[in-house]
Amino acid sequence: MESKMSEKKKFGFVVLHYCTLDMTKKCIAAIQEKMAQADYEIVVVDNASGNGTGKDLAECYKDTEHVSVLLSKENLGFAKGNNLGYVYAREDLHCDFICVMNNDVILLQDNFAQLVEAAYEAHQFAVMGPHIE
């Protein structure tokens, strides 16, 4: 019997943004680099940045594959801002795995997709967290 994991899974990355344009761009670039061989989507949620950086991100990535920028009209805070992106990744983009991260996180793992898929195959987790040093 063939494993369900043999199908290519779609990864979603929800990145919460507030005012720090360069940091968010570095986060996005790292995901793009490390996930280039995987099926992935990046959902940037601008939490009503007062300095216009949300609109700057939307303009910068408007023609970029795999990147969506959601502009919240109000600052939803950490949990609701992430939930906005999570629901979009799950319901609109149909992501199988969703990684919620702050914009100061830089993805370093070259085989991130393979590690997550292997862990899921072994443990069928609903929530997984990183090892932080």
List the model feature ranges, each with a label.
Residues 10-12, 41:
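Cell-envelope/extracellular polymer assembly enzymes that use nucleotide-activated donors
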Residues 15-26, 48:
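Active-site beta-to-alpha loop of glycosyltransferases that engages the nucleotide-sugar donor
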Residues 30-39:
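Short, acidic, metal-binding catalytic loop of nucleotide-sugar glycosyltransferases
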Residues 46-55, 74:
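A conserved acidic beta->alpha catalytic loop
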Residues 53, 81-82, 109-114:
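Acidic donor-diphosphate engagement hotspot in glycosyltransferases and nucleotidyltransferases
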Residues 72-90:
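Glycine-rich, basic loop-to-helix element that forms the pyrophosphate-binding segment
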Residues 94-106:
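Short beta-strand-to-loop acidic/aromatic patch adjacent to the donor-nucleotide binding site
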Residues 106-133:
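Conserved donor NDP-sugar-binding/catalytic core segment of glycosyltransferases
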